Amino acid sequence: MAKTLYEKLFDAHVVYEAENETPLLYIDRHLVHEVTSPQAFDGLRAHGRPVRQPGKTFATMDHNVSTQTKDINACGEMARIQMQELIKNCKEFGVELYDLNHPYQGIVHVMGPEQGVTLPGMTIVCGDSHTATHGAFGALAFGIGTSEVEHVLATQTLKQGRAKTMKIEVQGKAAPGITAKDIVLAIIGKTGSAGGTGHVVEFCGEAIRDLSMEGRMTLCNMAIEMGAKAGLVAPDETTFNYVKGRLHAPKGKDFDDAVAYWKTLQTDEGATFDTVVTLQAEEISPQVTWGTNPGQVISVNDNIPDPASFADPVERASAEKALAYMGLKPGILLTEVAIDKVFIGSCTNSRIEDLRAAAEIAKGRKVAPGVQALVVPGSGPVKAQAEAEGLDKIFIEAGFEWRLPGCSMCLAMNNDRLNPGERCASTSNRNFEGRQGRGGRTHLVSPAMAAAAAVTGHFADIRNIK
């Protein structure tokens, strides 16, 4: 029987499945950070249980960390407690930790792939909703809750029901300057923020194959923003070339054997999906969100929609509420909307290619008066590479702030946040009310679009910036 990639991955990891019961899956990799793990480790301690597979468990600090200092005491009391707990727990249970002073420290979904912890064919979980990022490698990766974190630590397994399957095919080639972020925002604009609910999405088509691994990670990172359980891209030569030689990747003959298996991780011809969505890549232009969920998105040169234009009363009410919160009026152009802050970073867009794209726009220009612009690399290795290429100097000379690795302004859990009423062009993944700070107004864009907003002081079409 022909199977989809998701079905192959799921079936290969079923440890036990009793009739009429939820299957028990084996978990190959468990990624841990300071926010969703303390109670899980406390649960192990209370029951006298060890971590079953410490060698398959990897921890880092990211959500709460300061991006201005490596001093743990400068991060606020709750953050300090959570980070100190992670240090204690990892030491006690024998889990490898990339702490604030480790050269590999960074956002968990940046660290995993760049260290070769993430590999095709694996099941990967983390107490974080954007774990879907790792699906870019042809791995089944999804976020879990704290009680599930404890279960995986204790058993290296997890009960999971089978999801429905969705194929999203982006046909043809994207125009120059159109990034994975624009593609995924256009997809969510078409499906809506709940269009993938109950599904695992496989992204395919020429435009997807043309993406680098970093672009594919951006794509899968935001699968959750259309309500999907996970996102997948089938592995290919792009994947294998990225993985080869990384710290935890197989070496020598083991790598060759792994590649032979990874090449089987494709959806079979004739396999059926529950839902199919198709887009034409050449129709996608630079995207900017205007509302308070990622599905409320338009091309940069389009007018903000009138809520009255939505046939669905729920969508109409949502649009009215979003415009009121965002301080916007129907019919205006986003290119006429001034911004206060710019954030280039997050598990969506903080990798070296993202920083190069932003630096290309920033080079020889200056951040507009009254705008604060932050560039936050996703990890120590990304920061080091960017500095080796001189990207930090480009940003600093242009008036951007060059920060230490961390989740930063993606979420209001650390010192980087918006003040009430401030408007931000952000490369992150969520534009919910209050996501970047109480009363803050978030617009999601690509790194190049964020840099363009920084130097012009408003949203701008990068295709017009020479």
Swiss-Prot record:
Superkingdom of this protein's organism: Bacteria
InterPro entries, A to Z: 3-IsopropMal_deHydase_lsu (IPR004430), Acnase/IPM_dHydase_lsu_aba_1/3 (IPR015931), Acoase/IPM_deHydtase_lsu_aba (IPR001030), Aconitase_4Fe-4S_BS (IPR018136), Aconitase_4Fe-4S_dom (IPR036008), IPM_dehydratase_rel_enz (IPR050067), IPMI_cat (IPR033941)
Cofactor: [4Fe-4S] cluster
CDD domains in UniProt: IPMI (cd01583)
Binding site for [4Fe-4S] cluster: C347, C407, C410
Catalytic activity: (2R,3S)-3-isopropylmalate = (2S)-2-isopropylmalate
Pathway(s) annotated for this protein in UniProt: Amino-acid biosynthesis; L-leucine biosynthesis; L-leucine from 3-methyl-2-oxobutanoate: step 2/4
Cofactor comment: Binds 1 [4Fe-4S] cluster per subunit.
Top EC class of this enzyme: lyase
Stored SUPFAM superfamilies: Aconitase iron-sulfur domain (SSF53732)
Sample GO molecular function, one term: metal ion binding
Enzyme Commission identifier(s): 4.2.1.33
Keyword terms of this UniProt record: 4Fe-4S, Amino-acid biosynthesis, Branched-chain amino acid biosynthesis, Iron, Iron-sulfur, Leucine biosynthesis, Lyase, Metal-binding
GO BP annotations listed: L-leucine biosynthetic process
Family: Belongs to the aconitase/IPM isomerase family. LeuC type 1 subfamily.
Assembly, per entry: Heterodimer of LeuC and LeuD.
Annotated function: Catalyzes the isomerization between 2-isopropylmalate and 3-isopropylmalate, via the formation of 2-isopropylmaleate.
Protein name: 3-isopropylmalate dehydratase large subunit
Native organism: Escherichia coli O157:H7
